[in-house]
From Swiss-Prot:
Protein's job: Required for oocyte nuclear envelope breakdown before entry of oocyte into spermatheca. In meiotic cells, required for spindle dynamics and probably for spindle attachment to the chromosomes. Zygotic role in the development of the germline and nerve cord. In mitotic cells, plays a role in spindle organization and centrosome maturation. Involved in asymmetric nuclear localization of cdc-25.1 during embryogenesis which affects cell division timing. Together with plk-2, regulates cytoplasm polarity in early embryos. May play a minor role in chromosome pairing and synapsis during oocyte meiosis I.
EC identifiers of the protein: 2.7.11.21
Superkingdom, taxonomy of origin: Eukaryota
Residue span, POLO box domain: 412-492, 514-596
Record protein name field: Serine/threonine-protein kinase plk-1
Family listed: Belongs to the protein kinase superfamily. Ser/Thr protein kinase family. CDC5/Polo subfamily.
Gene Ontology MF, one: ATP binding
Length: 648
């Protein structure tokens, strides 16, 4: 076992900067004790005194998360002792639901902790995008959280800061408990007296300074389950004082939509008397986890879209030919599913459970606004632009200081092919799934593995099929053939966004966002996805921007393929360079057009008022596009494309 270093006391400075400026981090970081060198990669986020970066082991090429704490933030002895204790507790842990800590070292400037990389961020970002999740998803996440808590408690460790933001997700959406800054060990019946935690999750015995132990983690898990199911903390209010009062008086309400097993478990975990709360082992065995089906895996799409828990469709309504156009309507309840007997076997329980989960998924979708968040996004951008936004003298340095990479969109369009003169627009999402928005307002989407197909009628009724099941109705043959042609063309003639992937467990539950509305101007193509993301690709300099109303953030992909993500309120507070500000002003106009002129766009998407007809056949300036004479034989020469997949 490697020795824990004693954190050296940093030199005192006469003028310490109060602002949380990014630490000075060398491009090559040396762990001299182990002879290991790390290359600093992209910025991952910040919290407290720490900034996190992707670090690549120079020898093995293994990528880890590097937590960097400037020594200037560790001036006092208690600060250094606290960090040493955090590492001492965390480094001995080894469990699938605990973030793995690899090493701990320092140089003259910083202290470094290398950790398991959790590429899908945390449950906090899931919450911001989804608010409430379905009960099967809540079982999936909560059961893993409890498994991790049980492991800690068996080692006499209390986490003491269990919350959505400390529950991280890897690429397989496995929950990983992290941030052991407040963790402590207890012996026997010892009760801790420290007032610590996060307001919405603090147990009453902590507030009352009555002494606390393992039960505070159970209380926090109760709060987490409540948030997952109902979209907000049980004791949240407009003021901290009122929140604490509600916690002390156990003043909360379980919504009537809750199932009995869920409500029962929440009440047990939020019992004001700590000794009456269940242990982690008892929670693990609670009937809630057996009261309905629980997925063994979830698709990445659940970070932004409700999964499809229903079966595949077996019959369809006949469709009439509609005018060419794009969909300007909202996603509606998923009332187009087939019988529940077609559910994947790894999530099947009994009929009542399946029906309830299906209804919950439909209810979750119904809560989406009819305009797919367009008015919400317009308001956010308008408020930003109404304020006096500070200028930036050193643009690049300032921008790097307040990025919010946790707000990066889950999905964006990486390729597109416009053939709306005849069929519609084809596109590829960043995960390599492919879709088409047809001129009759119907939509089709094929997952990255080429197995799971979704068809959405112009009425927004959804149907699901397996490409290899033989159950595809003949009515869809032409559209599936066109989808394959679009897919083949983008793979063969546009710069690849990545290789295809094999299907993984849980992918059969995926509901992917689809292109809802689009149009082209002389300057850009404007795309609106069904999950609320608005994307604008500028033709002249190939800069792209994606705006998410749920995260209240904007992501730019610049000419150098760098992805830069900022919260809108940070741009207002800290400043926005002109190179981005004028694009936000343009975006406001385009969002307004998406809201007010969708009916005009739907009549003829290939001939916009400000775009000459010849533009419909012109190719945008993309390094990944080829000339018309090189087009695939099954796609006409008027197809155009633009590749925006960034190199990270």
């Amino acid at each position: 076992m490697n020795r824990l270093p004693n954190i050296a006391k940093p030199p005192q400075k006469s003028n310490q900067r109060k602002e949380k400026a990014p630490p000075e981090v060398p491009a090559l970081i040396a762990d001299k004790d182990r002879g290991t060198y790390y290359e600093k990669g992209r910025f991952l986020g910040k919290g407290g005194f720490a900034h996190c970066y992707e670090l690549t082991n120079r020898a093995t090429r293994e990528v880890v998360a590097g937590k960097v704490v400037p020594k200037s933030m560790l001036v006092k002895q208690y600060q250094r002792d606290k960090m040493t204790q955090e590492v001492q507790i965390h480094r001995e842990l080894g469990h699938i639901n605990i973030v793995k800590l690899f090493n701990f070292f320092e140089d003259n400037l910083n202290v470094y902790i290398t950790l398991e990389l959790c590429a899908r961020r945390s449950l906090m970002e899931l919450h911001k995008r989804r608010k409430a999740v379905t009960e099967p998803e809540a079982r999936y996440f909560t059961h893993q959280i409890v498994d991790g808590v049980l492991y800690l408690h068996d080692l006499n460790i209390i986490h003491r800061d269990m919350k959505l933001g400390n529950l991280f997700l890897n690429d397989d959406l496995v929950v990983k408990i992290g941030d052991f800054g407040l963790a402590t060990t207890v012996n026997g019946d010892e009760r801790k007296k420290t007032l610590c935690g996060t307001p919405n999750y603090i147990a009453p015995e902590v507030l009352n300074k009555a002494g606390h132990s393992f039960e505070v983690d159970i209380w926090a898990v109760g709060c987490i389950l409540y948030i997952l199911l109902f979209g907000q903390p049980p004791f949240e209010s407009k003021s901290l004082e009122e929140t604490y009062s509600r916690i002390r008086h156990n003043n909360y309400t379980i919504p009537s939509i809750a199932t009995q097993p869920a409500a029962s478990l929440i009440r047990k975990m939020l019992d004001p008397e700590p000794t009456r709360r269940p242990t982690a082992k008892q929670v693990q065995r609670d009937g809630f986890f057996k009261s309905g089906f629980m997925p063994t895996r979830l698709p990445v799409s659940c970070l932004t879209m409700v999964p499809k828990f229903g079966g595949h469709e077996t019959s369809m309504m006949e469709e009439n030919v509609a005018p060419r156009g794009v969909d300007a309507r909202s996603q509606r309840p998923l009332n187009g599913r087939a019988g529940l007997s077609a559910l994947p076997q790894h999530i099947v329980s009994n009929n009542a459970d399946r029906e309830r989960a299906q209804q919950q998924a439909a209810e979750a979708t119904f809560r989406e606004p009819e305009d797919a968040y367009l008015s919400q996004l317009f308001h956010q951008v308008a408020v930003l632009l109404e304020q006096r936004i500070p200028g930036l003298e050193e643009e690049e340095a300032a921008l790097d200081g307040y990025q919010s990479p946790e707000c990066l969109p889950v999905f964006w369009i990486s390729k597109w092919v416009d053939y709306s003169d005849k069929y519609g627009i084809g596109y590829q999402l960043c995960d390599n799934s492919v879709g088409v928005l047809f001129n009759d307002n119907s939509r089709i989407m094929l997952d990255q593995a080429g197995n799971e197909l979704t068809y959405i009628e112009k009425s927004n009724k959804e149907h699901y099929f397996s490409m290899h099941s033989g159950e595809m109705p003949g009515l869809l043959n032409k559209k599936v053939t066109l989808l394959k042609y679009f897919r083949s063309y983008m793979n063969d003639h546009l710069v690849k966004a990545g290789e295809g992937s094999e299907q993984r467990a849980g992918d059969d539950l995926a509901r992917l966002p689809t292109l809802r509305v689009w149009f082209r101007t002389k300057s850009a193509i404007v795309l609106h996805l069904s999950n609320g993301t608005v994307q604008i690709n500028f033709f002249n300099d190939h800069v792209k921007m994606m705006m998410c109303p749920l995260m209240q953030a904007v992501t730019f992909i610049d000419q150098n393929k760098r992805m830069l993500t900022y919260k809108l309120n940070n741009l207002q507070r800290n400043g926005c360079p002109e190179k981005f500000l004028h694009r936000l002003k343009y975006a406001k106009t385009m969002i307004e057009r998406l809201m007010s002129d969708a009916n005009v766009v739907s009549q003829n998407p290939a001939r916009q008022p400000d775009m000459p007809r010849s533009m419909a056949a012109a190719r945008s300036a993309s390094a990944g596009s080829r000339g018309p004479n090189q087009a695939a034989s099954h796609l006409p020469q008027s197809a155009s494309g633009s590749n925006i997949h960034p190199r990270r």
